[in-house]
Amino acid sequence: MRRIYAAWTLVAAAGVMDCSPRLEKAAAFTLGPDSQVIVFPFMFQGYNIVVLPTTKYGDLKGNARRRVASFLEHNISHAVWYFVVGGIAYKDDRSERLFSEMMDGYLKKISAGASKVYKGGRKMFSESLETVHEMIFECNKAGDGHVVKYGKSIINRLSDMIENAPTGISAEEKREYRRFWSRVKERAGFLYSTERLRRVVEVEKIVCNACKEICLKLKEEELMGLLAEGKMKKDLKATVDEDEIGHCLYLEYTVVNTSLLLDAHREHGGDVTRELVKQMLLGKKGDEIDRRYINKVANVVKERQRREMEKKEEEKKKEEEKKKEEEKRKEEKKKKKEEKKEEKKKKKEEKKEEKKEEKKEEKKEEKKEEKKEEKKEEKSGKSLREGEASEEAEMPSVEVGGARRKTGKKSEGGRKRYKIHRRVSRWRKSPEKIKEEWDKGSEEKWRGRSLEEIKEQKVFHDIMGVLELLRSEDADKFFIDTGDYTKGGSERQRMVAIGVLESGGKRMAGVVEVGTFKDSSSGCPVVYHLMFRVTGIEGMGDVMSPEFAEANDIEKIDKNREYQDEGMFVYPRGVRFETVKETDAFQIVWGNPSNTSKVLRRLTIQRRPYVI
């Protein structure tokens, strides 16, 4: 360990991560009276997140599970210790011996206990980190915890060093020696004070809880956006070798004024604290968080809550209106049904009455006929009687059986400009045509792919609607510039946006990648790479890194008349998509040409998190 005079050493080292309490590298900080290192409940390996605040042991798989279990069992307590307390380096090993005697076994025991509880599967990682802090810095009511005792031993050693200054040095050197170690003793008194240790535990608990709530409340793609934007994993990485840290598990931190953070939590509540922690995760430095900034965040949160309340009231009002309309429709439907029923009943009654009338008429007709018959019979009888007197009398004609005559009637009844490379625009064509062109092309990556593979890849590459967002003035609100690099003799730029692709009943979170180079003649950026890459939270670090872009990019770009102006791009007939721009998202929706209400695919690009 190197010699440090100006500050207490706060360390997260490669040695700690590699299952050893021995420190090989150190990061030093000068802390103010109220400043404190806060450990975030996220565990990293290289660029990637291995453990989230909400991760339980059962969520971990394979090698990640073994490595995390080993880290917890052997190193978690030592890592927390060197973040929060650190150590004093001197020319001999007296400090190391005291630490080994009093703290090493104590910390190992806490790590083993925390690991056992975490493996039980009930606790989240954030809760385990809280427990480790509580156990290490535990102070009883009398303020006589293990760390306090260790601190007293350190102070006694420092007092002894001050009293027994080295011999053989001048009076001036002796005064300087005692002055320096007196300052160190004063600092040690602060570091190991009961008040500070209790505050350490309280603040860490608040931060861990805030991180947990952030992860629980955000959608996967929103959390991906937060982590992609954040710089919390960069502070430690800047002080430790890239290759070394790429193979180690490590925690990250920030230095913040704990008194201000506690005051903010007590005055403004959990919502403001959560937003402050979120801003830290987005890269806000602790020394930038003062009372003025806290008030600014509180106002932002208050305004957001007001808008949310208005939105809820509006939605509630709409819901009530919708409910009233629905009830009105039901009443009208019921009324129409009853009216229809009544009308049907009325018609039935009318029909019944008509039948009665018809029967009456029939009876009247029958009676008339009967009377006619009677008259005829009377007349006929008279004629017969007259015929008896005269045989030459004529016989009258009669209707046989009383039949009626038939009537003969039947019953009645300003923007940014981009050029598009052919390797991007060809994805708008049919799979057969795409395959034909790739097979004739020079890129080994695509030559010889099956038609099925081309069809699958078309879903991820045929996203030309992204260009509408890219050339708009709001592009920077959605896309993160991951930096420039050179490959195959050309300078290239890569931009990434977090998004969700819905296709074939699947919902896939990932990133929209845009690769560009500058046209040498016009200086206009040319889009030569455009795709949606499926990735989860655990792979975000790699996907966002410049190394990933360079490794996965094509070796050489054919620049010989291979691109056209973006405005000339046209989709073939029958293809339909529309773009929908909202405050926090940009959507591209592909509909069925024969039935526009049916959505075939939807790509939603998330807005970057708001930095206050």
UniProtKB/Swiss-Prot annotation:
Report the leader peptide range. Answer: none
Compositionally biased intervals (Basic residues): 331-349
User: Which InterPro entries did the record assign?
Assistant: DUF3654, UPF0329
Task: Locate the region Disordered.
Answer: 304-424
Tell me where the transmembrane regions lie.
none
Q: Where is the composition biased (Basic and acidic residues)?
A: 304-330, 350-388
Q: What is this protein called?
A: UPF0329 protein ECU05_1680/ECU11_0050
Q: Which family does it belong to?
A: Belongs to the UPF0329 family.
Classification via Pfam families: DUF1609, DUF3654
